[in-house]
Amino acid sequence: MPHVTPAPAVRMRGIHKRFGAVQANADVSLQVAPGTVHGIVGENGAGKSTLMSVLYGFYRADSGQIEVFGQPVNIRNADDAIALGIGMVHQHFMLVDTLSALENVMLGAEPHWLLARAQAAVRLKLEALMQTTGLQLDLDCLVADLAVGDRQRLEILKTLYRGAKILILDEPTAVLTPQETGHLFQVLDGLRKQGTTIVLITHKLKEVMRLCDQVTIMRAGRVVQDLAVAEASIEGLAEAMVGRKVNIGRSHGPPSAPGQVLLQARNLLVRDALHVTRLKDLNLRLHAGEIVGIAGVSGNGQSELLDLLSGLLQPASGQLELGGRTFEASAWLDPGTARELGLAHVPEDRQARALVMNFPAWESAVLGYDSLPAYGHGGWLNHQHMRRATGQYMERFDVRPRNPELQSSKFSGGNQQKLVLARELGQAPKVLLVGQPTRGVDIGAIEFIYSQLRALRAAGCAVLLVSSELDEILALSDRVIVMYQGAVTGELPIADCSEARLGMLMLGGAVQ
């Protein structure tokens, strides 16, 4: 008998989707083979999440056609998608913390989800699913008590319970340790072997090469390339995404002798308003001319550490030495004093804490520094000087468009981040605290930000880098400190670091 090629699991033709003046998808066509893992990559704003939201029924395309397993379909909403066997796991989990794992699966899927008889039947089905997929977890545990990796397994179980044959995953490893990522990939590989079709939205090109069969690259709302992963390379994918060659890999150069200690923290203890310990017995030193990376799953005390060292948070106990001065918990430094002593801070959330979104760029570019002599004297502010300085920052840090009058919210994420970096690095700091410097930032902007941090290191600045991206920590750091539940679980020179070793420390293990 002649071989019959199966119909694609998904075929999208000529998809157009516009939001006001923004063309999010322009004549996009996509074909996903059944029983494969298909990666979709592209910079922020490339249109990949919009395309998958059209497939899942969150948005309706302005025009175009969709086929699922060879049949033309009209997907009006998520219920239609689920009925067609399409499931989606979002980057930000959609779970109810106060319900158990079992109840979360049943919620919205079973009309009598509170009845014991219904729960017993669903439990049997879920136990069978866990056995066949390897997605093991405690069904009676409250979601609030589940680890991040378990929450993701629960989200996948939810979609499979509802009959998903096509599984869309949006940045699934963003909050996972390397070990959790490895387990997830084992599960996804098993699902692929069982015939499930998986669409993976990601910006981590190593993961595409490791897991996917086929990859589609999008840029500016269009598909620019579609190829088998066996024919692809990380460098080629990055170039296709950006439209030019980029370099964001490791580039440490020869190790240099540590310079003088510019910041020293001892025995830091932080409790929140509910008296829950967030940092405990934390010791830290930063030397001139080094980048120290703080690795760990988000929520393990990294944010509190940045706030503490920048003067935004006061400890219950501990000591800090900075700029020749010593600060005790009872008389901690404030942000203004920190800036006067040469410490600059790039917060993790640029929109909420680094910029005023309805301010013009020139006002955002001088926040915290408007008392400098360059910006006025005698209590009078010289707005023209501020505008001129902002224009110079924009030129130096390649902020686009170069318009100091443009509202801060109108810049892309990458250009907002460059504006914040321009403000903080423009003062030639001795110590820089930087949180999540490339979160939501395109590859081209990442390359620029990396070059600026490396240049700062070469100029003798001490940089403390907090990042949830392990590749970023490994690419930039001279020394890595790992945090787990508010404490340091290990400290390693970069030469001794590997993803596996750091991953064990991120889970609370000891240095091997």
Predicted regions and their residues:
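Glycine-rich phosphate-binding loops of nucleotide-dependent enzymes
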Residues: 2-512
